[in-house]
Amino acid sequence: YYEAPPDGRHLLLQPAPAAPAVAPAAPASWPHQQRRQALDEFAAAAAAAADAQFQDEEEDGGRRV
């Protein structure tokens, strides 16, 4: 990345700091982790329901009104 000093002089490009190979997992007690898990479960349930409805329509020949 590039850092310019506040007085307007330009520095040479500096190598970016090394990022950890694996991000540490957030504790499950964090609220955003709980919301994410709930959203994941809801998305899985919605996908399963949509797939089941699609299968029903396929068995009926696709004519569902």
Swiss-Prot record:
Record flagged with keyword Repressor: no
Disulfide bonds: none
Biased composition (Low complexity): 17-28
Region (Disordered): 17-36
Any one biological process term the GO annotation gives: neuropeptide signaling pathway
Molecular function per GO: hormone activity
UniProt KW keywords: Hormone, Neuropeptide
Subunit structure: Monomer.
Biological role: Neurohormone that anticipates ovarian maturation. Acts as a true gonadotropin and stimulates vitellogenin biosynthesis.
Protein's UniProt name: Ovary maturating parsin
Species annotation: Locusta migratoria (Migratory locust)
